[in-house]
């Protein structure tokens, strides 16, 4: 076991799935297919074996948070207004964070009756391409300096204190922030914040994004598997973009396969792998829960912080 996992309890899949009594899975395979990332693979048994026990654990964390807030209100002799339970989800590009986040959104909404569950991605807090070009950071897109972290922290602070917010929306099709389009977040009971950067050091070193999380999850996998998934995703993005000249990836569809593969491999090595090794993976041990995925995309190990 690596030293960084000394403060975690490792739980194998067989043990984990026994931690929740068998119940009816609250979604169908077609629903599951509609929410998964297009290069990801997930079946209903993964929901039953992994995610239903995870939602049960989320229930435990949320109850503990509510009990703590109630006790603090007695100590302070004042009422503490209800706050959303905020879950951070991090991990590498192409590891399956989005699938995990969207699945949790549905399962939580169907487990906690009448709960409003919102999901935001930190892609919306990327600087627009025009700003990145001006600062000569376009080739560093996804690295910490390409995000408006102050805006992200301001958003989380407002949400935690009961304010409604509007945040920018990012499009992978145009590879940029969509002008004049926002996502409104209004009084959620649960907020899931998904992104590669949610556990990273802030630029001002005074406040962490993760300071606002009630529970943090890191989706993990061996690097060689993530690389394979990334290259598969790149190829599928080109297939989707083939007949859409407005799609950012359309420009690559006119190239030969060796040229495309070379671009994808260089992007992985010089941007995504570098970002993973320097900024993302070092934050892994800040998570409360680490979900480790095997080559077949199924979660084979769970690490729970002691």
Swiss-Prot record:
The gene is coaA. Pathway: Cofactor biosynthesis; coenzyme A biosynthesis; CoA from (R)-pantothenate: step 1/5. GO terms for cellular component: cytoplasm. It is an enzyme of class 2 (transferase). It catalyses: (R)-pantothenate + ATP = (R)-4'-phosphopantothenate + ADP + H(+). ATP binds at residues 91-98. It is found in: Cytoplasm. GO terms for molecular function: ATP binding; pantothenate kinase activity. Belongs to the prokaryotic pantothenate kinase family. Pfam families: PRK. This is Pantothenate kinase. Keywords: ATP-binding, Coenzyme A biosynthesis, Cytoplasm, Kinase, Nucleotide-binding, Transferase. It comes from Streptococcus suis (strain 05ZYH33). InterPro entries: P-loop_NTPase, PanK, PRK/URK. Its EC number is 2.7.1.33. One of its GO terms (biological process) is coenzyme A biosynthetic process.
């Amino acid at each position: 076991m690596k030293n960084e996992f000394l403060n975690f309890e490792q739980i194998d899949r067989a043990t984990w799935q026994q931690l929740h009594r068998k119940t009816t899975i609250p979604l169908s395979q077609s629903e599951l297919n509609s929410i998964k990332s297009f290069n990801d693979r997930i079946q209903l048994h993964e929901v039953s074996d992994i995610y239903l026990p995870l939602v049960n654990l989320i229930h435990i964390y949320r109850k503990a948070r509510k009990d703590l807030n109630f006790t603090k209100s007695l100590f302070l002799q004042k009422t503490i207004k209800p706050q959303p339970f905020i879950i951070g989800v991090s991990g590498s590009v192409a590891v399956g964070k989005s699938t995990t986040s969207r699945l949790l959104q549905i399962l939580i909404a169907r487990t906690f009756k009448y709960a409003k569950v919102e999901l935001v991605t930190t892609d919306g807090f990327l600087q627009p391409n025009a700003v990145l070009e001006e600062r000569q950071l376009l080739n560093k897109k996804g690295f910490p300096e390409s995000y408006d972290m102050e805006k992200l922290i301001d958003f989380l602070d407002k949400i935690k204190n009961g304010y409604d917010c509007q945040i920018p929306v990012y499009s992978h099709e145009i590879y940029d922030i969509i002008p004049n389009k926002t996502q409104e977040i209004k009084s959620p009971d649960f907020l899931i914040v998904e992104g590669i950067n949610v556990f990273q050091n802030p630029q001002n070193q005074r406040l962490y994004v993760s300071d606002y999380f009630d529970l943090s999850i890191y989706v993990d996998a061996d690097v060689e598997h993530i690389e394979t998934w990334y290259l598969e995703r790149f190829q599928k993005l080109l297939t989707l973009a083939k007949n859409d000249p407005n799609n950012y990836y359309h420009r690559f569809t006119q190239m030969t396969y060796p040229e495309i593969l070379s671009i994808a491999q260089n992007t992985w090595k010089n941007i995504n792998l570098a970002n993973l090794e320097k900024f993302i993976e070092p934050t892994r041990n800040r998570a409360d829960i680490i979900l480790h995925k095997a080559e077949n995309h199924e979660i084979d190990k769970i690490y729970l912080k002691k």
